[in-house]
């Protein structure tokens, strides 16, 4: 046992076990004459650990070597005394520390590490503007990894039909962004996302759609594509080993693999590297661009627009066994189960569509999907009767903190998937630094809506998790808010291989 003082324990540490001191029985020690006080005072005081270690070995030879009885007695009685004394002192210090209230203890403050992050907006068909922002400071924006420039946020810049890039460096705030395209009354709004080794996108009509694969990495990527349709899995020639060069974008017409007109979901998996995948749909009735998402057992589709004429739920089962999905609508008057959506069965490796037009009755809602195994889902909506635009409502995260940078005015919808009312507050920071406060209460299982007056960075903080999105004021498009993970007392690091 060490003779140094024990340190105070932090709140999350377990107390160190103190070894029990065992005394040597008198019968185990050979009898010796007592030493006089003058003999003991002449000897140096031994270290406690050293004194405990100096127990003579058994045998006559070792006893004969101890020719100074006075020294022998001093070593034997001082060792245990020192050990017991130090043990008592250490125990007293430990008890005293535990008696101090937690607020009075000194603890090292752990500062969260803000690592760099790169986001990519898949390119749209029309001329698009990129909106990038964060809680403050500046970000790098541009149309490729090699063409980035520093800008104060929030910022708007034209990217036309190119992919939009947003990058933060170490120490900068967490970025968010979106790309908005609006031409001829048809609007697309797609979030900027981080690269991954795979993802899924869904379209209603593969004959008029294409995949867009963006490689924002510094090395080449090789991807495989699998399509899940109403008749099951579709793997045809040309869907394997597709190479995308570093910093390049590859457009893959889906009609080459499936020329049908029923919904399909494309699963894109990168054998090498990381990619960002988008899907672009165009037709006489409108256009839309969506970004890849991941399968999950619980999915949220926030900000379903009100007064739409068509609402079709597209669900895919990427697994190998049949599963069941239930749908709950979070509406202004409270939660309800849409007719025909209480239990939806889906065969493995297939995609189905469920018409919710009458069940939702044109009400603005958020949807929650629950399944036995991970599923993929989106909601296809068409505008008011007589309009031509459409949109895909994509999944959004549930969190106490929601953020997004929007490129235009719109309607904010927040839904509460919990069982208790949620109060929230936040603000919209405009492109010129002006701030607009946003606050309210969302009852349990309900949806709240309010105006987003202009472009800017939107930051919402709730008393409990919320889901949300912004619906465009012009045309028909829905942009999901990004869930921001709550900071913990530790380091949170996102490693970006592009930051060398």
What are these regions (language model features)?
Residues 2-78:
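Terminal targeting segments of Actinobacterial cell-envelope proteins
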Residues 70-131, 176-213, 275-318, 375-420, ...:
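Conserved functional hotspot residues at active sites or interaction interfaces
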Residues 79-101, 266-268, 325-327, 367-369, ...:
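Hydrophobic alpha-helical membrane segments, chiefly transmembrane helices and signal peptide h-regions
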Residues 113, 118-119, 213-235, 270-271, ...:
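Short acidic, flexible loop segments centered on an aromatic residue
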Residues 130-169:
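Extracytoplasmic/periplasmic/luminal assembly and interaction segments
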Residues 144-160, 233-261, 335-362, 431-457:
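Intrinsically disordered, low-complexity Pro/Gly/Ser/Thr-rich segments with frequent PxxP/GP/PP motifs
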Residues 161-175, 262-271, 364-372, 453-471:
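Short, aromatic- and glycine-rich surface loops/edge beta-strands on solvent-exposed regions
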Residues 295-373:
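Long, internal scaffold/assembly segments composed of regular secondary structure
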């Amino acid at each position: 046992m060490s003779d140094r003082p024990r340190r105070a324990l932090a709140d999350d540490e377990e107390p160190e076990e103190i070894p029990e001191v065992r005394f040597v029985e008198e019968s185990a020690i050979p009898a010796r004459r007592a030493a006089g006080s003058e003999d003991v005072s002449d000897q140096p005081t031994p270290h406690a650990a050293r004194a405990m270690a100096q127990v003579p070995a058994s045998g006559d030879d070792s006893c004969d070597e101890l020719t100074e009885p006075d020294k022998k007695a001093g070593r034997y009685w001082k060792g245990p005394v020192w050990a017991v004394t130090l043990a008592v002192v250490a125990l007293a210090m430990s008890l005293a520390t535990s008696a101090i209230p937690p607020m009075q203890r000194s603890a090292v403050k752990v500062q969260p590490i803000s690592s760099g992050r790169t986001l990519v907006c898949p390119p749209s068909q029309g001329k698009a503007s990129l909106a990038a922002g964060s809680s403050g400071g500046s970000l790098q924006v541009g149309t490729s990894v090699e063409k980035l420039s520093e800008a104060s946020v929030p910022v708007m810049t034209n990217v036309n039909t190119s992919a939009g890039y947003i990058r933060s460096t170490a120490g900068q705030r967490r970025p968010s962004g979106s790309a908005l395209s609006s031409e001829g009354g048809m609007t697309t709004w797609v979030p900027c996302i981080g690269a991954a080794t795979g993802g899924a996108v869904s379209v209603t009509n593969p004959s008029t759609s294409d995949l867009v694969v963006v490689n924002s990495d510094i090395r080449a990527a090789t991807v495989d594509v699998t399509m899940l349709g109403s008749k099951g899995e579709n793997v045809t020639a040309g869907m394997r080993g597709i190479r995308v060069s570093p910093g390049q974008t590859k457009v893959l017409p889906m009609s080459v693999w499936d020329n049908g007109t029923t919904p399909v979901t494309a699963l894109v998996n990168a054998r090498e590297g990381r990619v960002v995948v988008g899907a672009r749909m165009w037709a006489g009735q409108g256009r839309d661009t969506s970004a890849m998402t991941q399968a999950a057992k619980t999915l949220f589709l926030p900000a379903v627009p009100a007064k739409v004429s068509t609402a079709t739920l597209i669900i895919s089962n990427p697994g190998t066994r049949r599963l069941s999905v239930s749908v709950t609508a979070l509406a202004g008057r409270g939660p309800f189960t849409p007719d025909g959506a209480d239990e939806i069965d889906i065969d493995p490796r297939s995609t189905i569509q469920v018409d919710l037009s009458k069940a939702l009755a044109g009400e603005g809602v958020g949807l929650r999907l629950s399944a036995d195994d991970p599923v993929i889902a989106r909601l296809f909506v068409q505008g008011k009767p007589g309009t031509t635009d459409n949109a895909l409502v994509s999944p959004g995260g549930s969190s106490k903190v929601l953020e997004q940078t929007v490129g235009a005015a719109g309607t904010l919808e927040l839904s509460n998937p919990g069982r208790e009312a949620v109060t929230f507050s936040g603000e919209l920071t405009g492109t010129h630094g002006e701030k607009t406060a946003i606050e309210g209460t969302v009852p349990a299982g309900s949806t709240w809506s309010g105006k987003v007056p202009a472009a800017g960075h939107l930051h919402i903080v709730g008393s409990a998790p919320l889901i949300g999105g912004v619906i465009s004021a012009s045309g028909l498009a829905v942009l999901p808010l990004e869930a921001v993970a709550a900071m913990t007392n530790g380091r949170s690091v996102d490693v970006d291989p592009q930051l060398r």
